[in-house]
From Swiss-Prot:
Transmembrane segments: 43-63, 68-88, 96-116, 150-170
Source organism superkingdom: Eukaryota
GO CC term, one of those recorded: membrane
Subcellular location(s) per record: Membrane
Low complexity composition bias: residue spans: 224-237
Primary location group: membrane
Keyword field: Membrane, Transmembrane, Transmembrane helix
Lineage summary: Eukaryota, Metazoa, Ecdysozoa, Nematoda, Chromadorea
Protein known as: Uncharacterized protein F59B10.4
Length: 264
């Protein structure tokens, strides 16, 4: 009568194999960061960035304290943000686009303000005063000198401009993702553009693998990637359960630290 042996994988070896509950199936896509973003979170995030959006109005108020231009621009900014939030809730992409363009304009303004602030730090105050005296009638340089004087008067202006630029960039990214999700849902939900999880251990290990020494998950994944891909019409490769029973007739088992041999 033939002798049969039951080979059970070692628990220490089997602990390296991720379970099916912990690892997604092959081909399952991971949702993007902004695909599952709740509309309420977008509303709260955009509302919290209103102070950063209003920095340009504060700068204009410091330069022109008696003008109605800062107040008008603040109202316009608030209206566009509110319109974008209503568009996100009602899923109307045309209501988000004006706010997105407005954010890009504000980003350019803050970058311009940051460059002037850095230039003002490099020029001493005496040089600025001499420039005012030597060029009193040149109108093209007047606005530039006003911004430089403002940057020299408020030393924290460059740091505030950098912080508000980062906030505006994040807000513009959120608005663009919301607009893209509403306007082009097929592009956002395209599985080819999403990251896919690696295949499970069972899909990598072939049925003809050596029963004496099961490979690790990294080795099985490497061997599976080196195999030629099958055609789309062909069925998926047969998978083997994590705890398979193998029968080897009339074979004496070799000593192995990876396997536990039970004689029947």
């Amino acid at each position: 009568m033939a002798n049969y042996h039951l080979m059970v994988p070692n628990p220490s070896r089997n602990a390296q194999i991720p379970s099916e509950a912990q690892r997604p199936m092959y081909g399952e896509s991971h949702p993007s960061l902004f695909a599952n973003m709740n509309n309420k979170k977008v509303v709260v995030a955009a509302a919290c960035t209103l102070p950063a959006d209003s920095l340009f109005a504060v700068m204009l108020y410091l330069i022109y304290p008696d003008s109605f231009l800062p107040s008008t621009l603040f109202i316009v900014n608030f209206s566009l943000v509110l319109l974008a939030l209503l568009g996100i809730n009602s899923k109307v992409s045309s209501m988000i686009l004006p706010a997105l363009v407005w954010k890009c304009v504000l980003l350019l303004f803050l970058l311009f303000l940051g460059c002037i602030s850095v230039d003002a730090y490099q020029v001493p105050a005496t040089d600025l005063e001499e420039a005012h005296v030597s060029q009193p009638q040149e109108q093209p340089h007047r606005s530039m000198m006003v911004w430089k004087d403002l940057a020299a008067k408020y030393p924290m202006l460059p740091f505030i401009a950098v912080a508000c630029t980062i906030v505006l960039a994040v807000e513009a990214r959120v608005f663009f993702s919301a607009w893209q999700k509403i306007c082009c849902p097929a592009v956002v939900n395209d599985e080819s553009n999403l990251e896919k999880s690696p295949p499970s251990y069972n899909a990598c290990v072939r049925a003809t693998a050596s029963e004496k020494d099961l490979p690790s998950y990294e080795d099985a994944l490497k061997n599976s990637s080196q195999q030629p891909s099958t055609s789309s019409s062909s069925s998926s490769p047969p998978s083997r359960p994590p705890h398979s029973v193998y029968t080897i007739p009339d074979v004496k088992m070799h000593k192995s630290s990876m396997m536990t041999v039970i004689s029947l």
